[in-house]
């Protein structure tokens, strides 16, 4: 069976600001594709694209919609980068009470989307 999640899109107001935000926070390079009014910067995992920062006239960022969560090595360091790039912490690093499950946090990205983080430490 294929992975359960096929693809995700993170809406933007300022596409280039959002790309800079995610590249800096997660230390990745996101290939950019543009087609007329639509723009995408793609998150890749091994050889496949799993999601994108997406800009189109009818896409509106929100902290009230679906939450996409990213794995990271260190939540504290990642949240520091979020703050430096203009994001805000919505829920600080919090222990997941089920034994052995690690930690999570929530932040608002540069566009106002609510995003989650998960880490073992």
Where are these regions (language model features)?
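Structural motif
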Residues: 5, 48-51, 65-67, 102
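Mid-chain, well-packed structural core segment of small domains
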Residues: 62-88
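Conserved short beta-strand elements that form part of the metal-binding/catalytic scaffold
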Residues: 28-63, 114-119
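Catalytic core of tubulin tyrosine ligase-like
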Residues: 22
């Amino acid at each position: 069976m294929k992975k359960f999640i096929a693809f995700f899109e993170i809406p933007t107001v300022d596409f280039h600001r959002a790309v800079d935000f995610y590249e800096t926070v997660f230390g990745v390079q996101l290939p950019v594709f543009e087609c007329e009014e639509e723009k995408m910067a793609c998150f890749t995992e091994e050889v496949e694209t799993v999601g994108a920062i997406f800009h189109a006239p009818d896409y509106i960022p929100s902290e009230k919609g679906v939450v996409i969560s990213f794995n990271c090595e260190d939540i504290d360091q990642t949240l520091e980068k979020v703050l430096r790039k203009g994001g805000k912490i919505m829920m600080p690093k919090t222990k997941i009470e089920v034994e052995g499950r690690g930690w999570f946090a929530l932040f608002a990205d540069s566009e106002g989307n609510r995003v989650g983080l998960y880490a073992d430490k």
